[in-house]
A protein has these predicted regions:
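Short, structured interface segments
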Residues: 1-14
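Structural motif
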Residues: 61-63
Length: 271
């Protein structure tokens, strides 16, 4: 009976204890050594607990070579392929089909918002980084959404009640989805954040909702851009950061590709 106790206290005890964060995480970012993660149960457990609680964890000491990313990912589970392949190389290239493959700065976003079920975890692994610029940026979407609920309840209600449309299309595919920016469970707890202005399509909502929805979205976006919420991190070769793609938004500063090399690899997995 204790195992199946459904009292509020028992349910709360079984539920993962989230630790919402803001810019203070720059001093307390969960960080692990790659060898501990790869070779010990304690290291793997620490990685999983960091993802569950903070939504983000940094690995140091990964051999800075192509292919290491998938070894790290498969320590946890099966890699989830996307329309970009089993993994992808984040480099500046001519005629890109995604903004990640440019040198421009990227605003905070979650990946694959145009999928009905975006992947749970994203991994980014630095192989080379000698360019000027290109620092990574992260924010806890659950923290920002929680603060939005306190500051502007109507904006929160709109973004959690009405869907946004997302679309990615190129010569090979056309993938679309529709979902709220903030997803709640049956008790009103925030369970997902889906935000990507690169993939956001025109709204398909009743006309009276269009202006209020844009205003609510703008309020949320302005909060996301507040440096008080930001984790700022320069990924050096051998560093691999993993984060909950349905909670933690990521972006980057622009960089000058003429000043050196920048080569990251990324992939996705579900927990």
């Amino acid at each position: 009976l204790r195992t199946h106790d459904c009292s509020p206290e028992a349910l709360a005890e079984r539920r993962p204890q989230l630790r919402l964060w803001d810019a203070d995480i720059n001093d307390t970012l969960p960080t692990l050594d790659c060898s501990d993660y790869m070779n010990t149960d304690a290291g793997m457990r620490a990685w999983i607990e960091a993802i569950q609680r903070h939504g983000v964890v940094l690995l140091r000491g990964v051999p800075a070579q192509p292919g290491q990313l998938l070894d790290v990912a498969r320590r946890i589970g099966n890699v989830r392929p996307s329309n970009f392949g089993e993994y992808y190389d984040v480099v500046s290239m001519p005629n890109p089909n995604a903004s990640a493959y440019t040198a421009m700065g990227l605003e905070l976003h979650t990946d694959l918002a145009n999928w009905n079920s975006p992947p749970d975890v994203q991994l980014l692994f630095c192989i080379k980084s000698s360019v000027r610029g290109g620092e990574s940026l992260f924010a806890d979407g659950f923290k920002v959404a929680t603060d939005l609920r306190d500051r502007d309840p109507e904006a929160f209600r709109l973004l959690s009640s009405h869907p946004m449309d997302f679309r990615f299309h190129d010569d090979a595919c056309d993938i679309r989805a529709s979902a709220p920016t903030i997803v709640l469970d049956g008790e009103g707890r925030i369970t997902r954040v889906r935000f990507n202005n690169w993939l956001r399509a025109p709204m398909s909502l009743p006309e009276p909702l269009i202006e209020p929805m844009y205003a609510a979205l703008g309020t949320f976006w302005n909060m996301l851009r507040d440096p008080g919420y930001h984790l700022n991190l320069r990924l050096d070769p051998g560093c691999l950061i993993a984060y909950n793609n349905n909670r933690v938004l990521h972006g980057r500063a622009s960089f000058d590709p003429t000043t050196g090399e920048r080569h990251l690899q990324g992939c996705y997995l579900n927990l």
